[in-house]
Each structure stands twice: as structure tokens, then as C-alpha cells.
Curated annotation (Swiss-Prot):
GO cellular component term, pick one: plasma membrane
Membrane topology, record value: Peripheral membrane protein
GO-annotated molecular function: cytoskeletal motor activity
Organism per entry: Caulobacter vibrioides (strain ATCC 19089 / CIP 103742 / CB 15)
Protein name, per record: Flagellar motor switch protein FliN
Gene3D superfamilies: SpoA-like (2.30.330.10)
Pfam families cross-referenced by the UniProt entry: FliMN_C (PF01052)
The organism's taxonomic lineage, starting at the top: Bacteria, Pseudomonadati, Pseudomonadota, Alphaproteobacteria, Caulobacterales
Keyword presence, Repressor: no
Role summary: FliN is one of three proteins (FliG, FliN, FliM) that form the rotor-mounted switch complex (C ring), located at the base of the basal body. This complex interacts with the CheY and CheZ chemotaxis proteins, in addition to contacting components of the motor that determine the direction of flagellar rotation.
UniProt keyword annotations, A-Z: Bacterial flagellum, Cell inner membrane, Cell membrane, Chemotaxis, Flagellar rotation, Membrane
Subcellular location field: Cell inner membrane; Bacterial flagellum basal body
């Protein structure tokens, strides 16, 4: 996955991923055309927590779940459960979004 081939949701007057032009060579675009409409699942993971079933059952409304990340630390962005990028949480018009700050290359998943 080349960094210049990725498009992402951008906010504040910029294009959304669905509106962004696809910048691929003619041969590459023709080769990939059959998969352009295949849906993918994108997840932005704020952090993770481990606990026992007993601790889980004690959680209720108002409980605080402490995550393994610090405030301001990059979050992981997954496409179909595969880590592809890291980013920062942003707020735009009362909605959450993610600004991608790092593209993860194959084999650099650490």
C-alpha cells in the first residue's frame, strides 16, 4: 500500500474519502477497478483493557474503563482487522474523527 494512494476523511472544507480522486496509474486503476466497490471495515482503536470476567460483571453505567493509552498518544487504525495507520483524534462539528499521522508499511506492525 503506497502512502500516496490512500485517501481519508478530512474535515473543514477538505474532501471526504468518498469524494477524493483516485490517483493511480491507468494500468493499476484498471487492474483494481473490480474491487473499488468492495466494502471494508475501518476501526479507530483508542486503546485496550484486560480484566477478569468478575471485573467485567461489576461494570455499570458510570464505570470508568481505564485504557492502555495516554492522552494524546496515537491511536491505531485498522482496515479489516489489519493495522494500517496511526492517527490522532479530532473533533469536527461535534463529531469524532481521526487525522492519520503515520502509515504502517507491511512488516512494520510493531
Amino acid at each position: 500500500m503506497a502512502e500516496d494512494n490512500l485517501t481519508l476523511d478530512e474535515f473543514g472544507g477538505a474532501m471526504l474519502a468518498s469524494e477524493a480522486p483516485i490517483e493511480l496509474s491507468d494500468k493499476t486503476a484498471a487492474d483494481l477497478a473490480p474491487v473499488f466497490d468492495v466494502p471494508v471495515n475501518i476501526s479507530a482503536v483508542l486503546g485496550r483493557a484486560n480484566m477478569s470476567v468478575a471485573q467485567l460483571l461489576q461494570l455499570g453505567q458510570g464505570s470508568i474503563l481505564e485504557l492502555d493509552r495516554k492522552v494524546g498518544e496515537a491511536i491505531d487504525i485498522y482496515v479489516n482487522n489489519r493495522l494500517v495507520a496511526r492517527g490522532e483524534v479530532v473533533v469536527v462539528d461535534e463529531r469524532l474523527g481521526v487525522t492519520m499521522t503515520e502509515i504502517i508499511k507491511d512488516g512494520d506492525q510493531g
